[in-house]
Amino acid sequence: KSQHQYGQYLNLCHFGSLANDRSLSIVMRAANTLFEKFPEARNHLRIHAYGAPLDSLSQEAIHRYGFSDILLAHGRLERDPVTGISGREKVAQKMQEADVLILLHGNDEWCAEYIPSKFYDYLWSGRPIWGITHRNPQLDQMLLDRKSYLSADGDDAGIAMALEKIWLDWRQNQLLSPIWQPIGVDQAVSSILSHITQ
C-alpha cells in the first residue's frame, strides 16, 4: 500500500444509503461541537456522502449549522464513458483516498443482529474506519481488533470526542493505521470453532 497523502482537508467519507435512522446529522452535530472548540477546524473538515441522496435529518442539519460547504453530497458514482472506469472502481478509488471512512450502523434494534456489508468493503480499502454502532458488541470488537475509531449511536458526547480525536490525529498526520485483516474463510472457521468450544 502506498503512503497515505495528507492534504489541506480532513476528508471523512460515507458510502451507501442514508435514512433518518442512519443519518450524517449526528456527525454534523459533532462537527459543530468541534468547531466551537477548534474554530480553525471549520476550514479543514469535509464530510463526503457518496451514493444515495441525503436523508431529511442530514439536510436539516446542513441548514441549521450552515454546513453547505462542509457536507458535500456527490450522489452515485457512475461508469466513466471516456476512461471506461466503472462506478464500482471509482468507489474503491474514493474509499482509498479518504482520510477516514464513516460506518453508520443505524439505530434500529435489528442492528444489534448484523454486520453491515459496507464494513467488509471498508476493510479492503485499508483506510481508517470510524464506526458509529448500535448495541453490537461483535461488530465493536471487529472494529477495535482492526484499530478503528468507535462511537455508540445516541452518545452525542462520545461521538464528539471521537471526532475530536480524529481531528487531533489528522493534524499530527497520525490517523490510526488499520490492522490489515480482511476476513477470510480461515478466520471464520476459527471464530466458529472458538464459540463451539467455549
Question: Which sequence ranges carry the predicted segments?
Answer:
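Conserved donor-binding/catalytic core segment of Leloir-type glycosyltransferases
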Residues: 4-22, 28-31
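Nucleotide-sugar-dependent
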Residues: 22, 78-94, 101-120, 130-141
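Short hydrophobic signal-anchor/transmembrane segments that target glycosyltransferases
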Residues: 25-41
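Nucleotide-activated donor-binding/catalytic signature segment of Leloir-type glycosyltransferases, i.e.
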Residues: 38, 42-44, 48-52, 56-92
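Flexible glycine/serine/alanine-rich "lid" or loop that lines and gates the nucleotide-sugar donor pocket
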Residues: 96-97, 124
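A charged, aromatic-enriched C-terminal amphipathic alpha-helix characteristic of glycosyltransferases
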Residues: 153-161, 168-198
